[in-house]
Design a protein with these regions (language model features):
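Positively charged, aromatic-accented nucleic-acid-binding surfaces
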Residues: 1-38, 42, 63-113
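Major-groove recognition helix of helix-turn-helix-like DNA-binding domains
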Residues: 40-51
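Short, basic alpha-helical nucleic acid-contact segments in DNA-binding proteins
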Residues: 49-63
């Protein structure tokens, strides 16, 4: 008889937060990766549909704070808007189950900021 053992593997995702003019932003792709979302563009589309297109920034709106690895098409969202979106649970069915953990980390960051 074969012995089967389940090992809990915890993966850490580092999400870069950009501070610009006293506002905190995250890349939607980074949050999608942390949540295990396979289609980050669909994730960004969900944010637009849920909170409105104006909350997703790119192009001229991000030129003053995006990093050298980003381009004008890289979408950013305010951390506060990302928390709002995640709290609505719109994407529960497509995540790795870490939505509440991601919310907690973002809220903790905002409380210390």
């Amino acid at each position: 008889m074969a012995k089967v053992v389940q090992l809990p593997i915890i993966v850490t995702h580092n999400v870069k937060v950009v501070e610009h003019e006293n506002v905190s932003y995250v890349r939607t792709r980074d949050i999608a990766d942390a949540l295990g979302v396979k289609q980050p563009f669909e994730f960004t589309s969900d944010i637009r549909e849920t909170l409105g297109g104006q909350v997703v920034l790119n192009g001229e709106d991000t030129k003053d704070f995006r990093s050298g690895t980003d381009n004008a098409r890289t979408p950013y969202v305010k951390v506060s808007d990302m928390i709002k979106f995640l709290e609505q649970g719109v994407i529960n069915h497509r995540t790795n189950g870490t939505r509440k953990d991601v919310i907690a980390v973002l809220q903790s960051y905002m409380n210390t900021y």
